[in-house]
Amino acid sequence: MSIQSAIGLAFPASIFLAVLAVGMRVAPADLRYLLSRPSRLFRSLLAMNVLAPVIAVLVCKMFSLHPAVIVALVTLAVAPVGALFSQAMLPLVAPGDAAYARRLFFASIVLSVVLTPLTVELIQLIFGGEVHVNPLPVAEVVVSSVLLPLGIGLAIAQWWPAAMRWNSAIQTVSSIVLGVCSVALLVVVWSRLDLVIQEGTLTAIIMMTLLGLAVGHLLGGPGEDDRTVLAFATVSRHPGVAMVVASLMDQPLAPIGVLLAVIVSEIAVAPYELWRKRLRGTGHTTPGAR
């Protein structure tokens, strides 16, 4: 088995385990929580599922980007929130808003089954010949790698609560597999990164990231912690899902574009993350709505 084939199998496995672990920690009440707060749900979906893809499209139209980078940016914009998102929020917000992050992830996963393929279809119409993908395989990927393990995790939490003692181990294994896959993929494609980097590529990725942070921050509401959560939710998409979806498109270099976009985006969000940590440390943050 080649390294590429092994990575192709390991990425979906890491996604499955990560979402399974999250599903074991949440409950259906988490989705009802957002449904009972329509204003918060509307602002969240507007930022993550409407404005983030719009920003991706506009940025791609502004720059002369390699088609693989276009696919990468729009795929990341429509992918569900990353499985480690709620954990990443723990040092940045109050415990109550960390729960909001978990609920936001739950809603993002459920809604992504419909919204991700729909958005891919709309983007395909916008870009015409630059992006080709059948929305049905995209939906199948989201269902099999995200919705299915989430449902299994919820069932385990409901009918086999003793299994919770393995939750941390499952999450750890998932993180290790994802990390190893990312490093292995980076090693494999390092010599080909220059094939997708054109003039303005890094600027485009940074611009998309900063605009996404700004949109999430502004739509987060009056609570500083809510703003932090929604800002990161708008830009923190699951790289594994994005890579799997990108591999369905007719751009063989698209997974390389996803990896490049994730690396540059992580660097671009660092100043905002540092600011929110300092704000949290000074006690000047305000908790979000409950």
Question: Model-flagged regions — what are they?
Answer:
Residues 1-290:
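Alpha-helical transmembrane segments of multi-pass small-molecule/ion transporters
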